[in-house]
Design a protein with these regions (language model features):
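Metallocofactor- and cofactor-centric catalytic cores in central/energy metabolism, strongly enriched
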Residues: 2-88
Length: 88
């Protein structure tokens, strides 16, 4: 359930080329859906893509000035703990 500090969202397949568009949507709607943590999760074989997309997502968030933390992970179980929403 969403708390006053914002939500934790986990994106399975975070190395996808569609992820930056998702991040842009969260940034634009931050006032209505404050995302405090966005976990981008992918498989080990997708490491290079996840790192590239994750770096872009971090730059987007920094430029927008929203207090959203981008976390990259290859461990679904860790990422899904206490998640408010999950996207795939």
């Amino acid at each position: 359930m969403m708390n006053k500090d914002g939500v934790k969202i986990v994106t399975i397949g975070g190395g996808s080329s569609y992820t930056p568009e998702l991040v842009e949507g969260f940034i634009k709607r931050y006032d209505h859906l404050p995302v405090k943590e966005l976990w981008l999760v992918d498989i080990e074989a997708g490491r290079e893509k996840l790192e590239t997309v994750g770096a872009l997502a971090k730059r987007m968030v920094k430029k927008a000035g929203v207090p959203m933390k981008i976390i990259l992970s290859y461990d679904r179980r860790e990422a899904l703990k206490d998640a408010d929403f999950v996207t795939t």
